[in-house]
């Protein structure tokens, strides 16, 4: 093949697509503003470098609504290192920097979500993939912005639900990942108006699981589970410029632990579906997991598991000579997960 082929990824004469050009311009302008380079200096530029200070607040701005979050990471632009085809001279592989792209944003947030964020997550679980614009904001103790990362056309890639554990005293947080088409780092823009409603902390021990026909009263632990988005890259303009197009959702298995003495209904289900081969849709079940307030009387969030099917049942390992409650682990496949807000 001719080494001067215009489609060669390392060709210096290759013209970037319009999307890539705008992305580069956005990265450069935003970076200049953020780090106080000439002609882009702002009063908050120096403070922007302190966004990782201990005790600073992290927030998500979504359609004008400012949402406090526990933590946020990623999103800053980076480039891949591209290897050129081997050449006899010089005797080592040449490398160059590829086009910039934005990293995924990873965010820990409260399971009891404000309206804008709840709708985004709910739509994603219903396979209604909506792209959002917004910003990730870092402030100091007084809610003065230290930095702002503006994102465009972001789509959710993962929704991670925390584990539920009766013996735990720790709070649980939802983990969200979303992929922006491009991001722009900016300096802070002043003081953030703090949300009027406070975020509700949810302890991991406050939950209620219900599966019709099964005794779930002694379920001591539900393992964390994550819904993942599959993507199909779509070329825009030149072959170097790709946009992620949402494909299908990958729903996880549901795994839980309960006392052996209360596992009889689960084992009967396991016998029917697995040992006797009654594995049709008529043997599947629907389950609900309710996240409860501190009084254990008000539902804050309901997670529904559709088309559950048991495929594994077995005792947990117990060390010899220990006086512990014997427990079993149960695993079920799940075809769809949805969420709905409670009344709390």
Tell where the protein language model's regions lie, with residue ranges.
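Flexible domain-boundary/linker segments
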Residues: 31, 38-39, 124, 273
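Glycine-rich, low-complexity intrinsically disordered segments
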Residues: 48-344
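N-terminal secretory signal peptides
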Residues: 1-20, 29, 35, 40-46
């Amino acid at each position: 093949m001719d080494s001067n082929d215009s489609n060669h990824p390392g060709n210096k004469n290759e013209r970037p697509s319009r999307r890539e050009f705008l992305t580069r311009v956005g990265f450069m302008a935003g970076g200049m503003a953020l780090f106080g380079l000439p002609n882009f200096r702002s009063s908050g530029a120096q403070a922007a470098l302190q966004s990782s200070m201990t005790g600073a607040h992290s927030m998500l701005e979504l359609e004008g609504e400012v949402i406090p979050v526990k933590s946020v990471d990623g999103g800053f632009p980076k480039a891949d290192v591209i290897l050129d085809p081997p050449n006899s001279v010089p005797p080592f592989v040449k490398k160059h920097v590829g086009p910039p792209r934005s990293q995924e944003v990873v965010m820990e947030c409260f399971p009891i979500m404000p309206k804008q964020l709840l709708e985004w997550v709910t739509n994603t679980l219903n396979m209604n993939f909506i792209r959002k614009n917004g910003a990730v904001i870092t402030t100091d103790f007084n809610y003065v912005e230290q930095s702002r990362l503006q994102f465009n056309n972001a789509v959710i890639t993962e929704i991670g639900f925390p584990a539920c554990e009766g013996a735990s005293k720790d709070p649980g947080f939802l983990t969200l990942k979303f992929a922006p088409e491009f991001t722009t780092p900016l300096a802070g823009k002043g003081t953030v108006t703090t949300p009027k409603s406070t975020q509700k902390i949810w302890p991991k021990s406050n939950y209620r699981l219900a599966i019709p026909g099964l005794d779930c009263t002694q379920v001591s632990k539900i393992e964390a589970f994550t819904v993942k988005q599959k993507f199909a890259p779509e070329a825009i303009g030149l072959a170097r410029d790709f946009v992620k197009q949402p494909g299908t959702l990958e729903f996880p298995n549901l795994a839980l632990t309960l006392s052996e003495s209360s596992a009889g209904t689960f084992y009967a289900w396991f016998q029917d579906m697995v040992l006797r081969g009654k594995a049709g849709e008529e043997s599947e079940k629907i389950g609900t997991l309710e996240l409860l307030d501190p009084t254990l009387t008000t539902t804050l969030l309901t997670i529904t598991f559709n088309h559950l099917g048991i495929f594994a049942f077995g005792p947990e390992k117990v060390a010899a000579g220990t006086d512990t409650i014997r427990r079993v682990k149960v695993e079920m496949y799940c075809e769809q997960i949805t969420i709905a807000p409670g009344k709390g």
